[in-house]
Amino acid sequence: MTDLPFVSALVQADLPVWEQCLQTEFLQKMENGTLSEGCFKSYLVEDSLYLREYAKIFAWGMTKATTMAAMRTYYSLLSFVQENEDLTRLRYLEEYGLREADIQSLPLRPESRAYLDCMIDAARTGEGEAECLMACLPCMLSYGWLFQKLLQRSPAVKDTYYGALVLDYASPGYDAACRAWAERAEAACTGLSPERAARCRAIFRACSEHELHFWEMCATPRTDI
């Protein structure tokens, strides 16, 4: 039996956590079309605040990169997040009468802050590029997996108010980007010592668990918007 590539093995090991994400109240209600406006609006605000901080992981990645190719990877990640994810999110915010500039002073919720602190600490204190990628990959890869599953199980979700968001993350373009990032991570993790590989696995698992806490949090709307 052939061993799985490092990143594929990480994903396989964490699928039970991602399955739990899929079963959270927020995503279940999104899937069946009963998600409240308050919860969805709160998610959009929290996601906006989260993405601002998430971009800092890529900055740490650039400082740890040892080749121009690696630096371009982080630049492409940042560009993809800003250009691809922003379009739909900003349109939804506009429909709710919210501007991104107006919500930047709002605080992150504790679950988001804990998640971001975990990622930033892993990227800052890690030996190099591998740790940075392990910190940011669970968010990227799990989003693609979750929304593809949502669309496969309930195709009608694409016709709901949340359909544009679901289709963004379930799209072939997003999947191709995730595959490219996973390939870069695979290259960065090739030849790691057993101790460092174990640390990378621990980072990936911790961030997957923070993803679960994030989705659990989203079932309760913010009270400050």
What do these predicted ranges mean?
Residues 199-225:
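Acidic, carboxylate-rich catalytic segments that either coordinate divalent cations
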Residues 15-20, 34-64, 84, 134-144, ...:
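Alpha-helical bundle segments that constitute or directly flank the non-heme di-iron/ferroxidase center
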Residues 11-35, 54, 182-191:
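Short alpha-helical hairpin
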Residues 1-8, 12, 223-225:
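Basic/polar N-terminal segments that are highly enriched at the extreme N-terminus
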Residues 2-6, 115-121, 216, 220:
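Hydrophobic alpha-helical segments
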Residues 173-205:
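Long amphipathic all-alpha helical oligomerization modules
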Residues 69-176, 205, 209:
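Active-site-proximal alpha-helical scaffolds that flank and shape metal-associated catalytic sites
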Residues 61-65, 96, 122-126, 150-154, ...:
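Secondary-structure edge/capping motif, primarily at the C-terminal ends of alpha-helices
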